[in-house]
Amino acid sequence: MDSDTPPLIVDIDGTLTDESRALDPHVIPVLREWPARVVIATGKAMPFPIALCEFLGLDRTVVAENGGVVFVEATDELRLEGDHEAALAVGESYRDLGHDLGFGQIDLANRWRETELVVSLDQPLEPLEELAAARGLVVLDTGFAYHVTDPVVDKGTGLEAVCSELDLDPAEFLAVGDSVNDAQMFDLAGEAVAVANADETALERADRVTDASYGDGFLEAVAPYRD
């Protein structure tokens, strides 16, 4: 790789995975060998990207819960932003209306969340949006779940937090993603690439769109820096 390889911020689901959400094994050596900083940015709770970094041998630099949680191992900094109590209250009100979060009794999707709440896509959206708006929150449809989240945080604010810790500029970054929740980090990054399976918002905000989808799209996105 060239010494000018930029730092990388990358989504997980739909970007590093295949269509079944399994990690594409071909992305592993790329991430492990990337000579600049790698930031994993996801809507998932913090244990998921932390585990990914751990098993890939990467420094644990993560943006989780769509920017609500930021951890930078190099500076031992953990930042939590967002109104978790309001998000939990939305969930309680939603259940009071007879709806369900949709992830079963144990609910691994929400178990470790610290700033937001997620609801399965097979649950009704309109009442969730109404309850969220009443508490000053928004609902993001990432294509994998409905995220009840604070509008003051996103992956862009997460990237800014990482950069403030590491003395980097967001404009130095290559960003790769597939969803509406990647849009703000796309806006800040020096180059933003959407994989072909991305939603309309991500496609519109990207500087470049790959021909390939999912993990293959990620490989195409980073190929100019590996040739």
Curated annotation (Swiss-Prot):
Substrate binds at K155. Belongs to the archaeal SPP-like hydrolase family. Its cofactor is Mg(2+). It catalyses: 2-phosphoglycolate + H2O = glycolate + phosphate. Catalyzes the dephosphorylation of 2-phosphoglycolate. This is Phosphoglycolate phosphatase. It comes from Haloarcula marismortui (strain ATCC 43049 / DSM 3752 / JCM 8966 / VKM B-1809) (Halobacterium marismortui). Mg(2+) binds at D11, D13, D178, D182. NCBIfam families: HAD-SF-IIB, Pglycolate_arch, SPP-subfamily. The active site is at D11. It is an enzyme of class 3 (hydrolase). One of its GO terms (molecular function) is magnesium ion binding. Keywords: Carbohydrate metabolism, Hydrolase, Magnesium, Metal-binding. Its EC number is 3.1.3.18. One of its GO terms (cellular component) is cytosol. SUPFAM superfamilies: HAD-like.
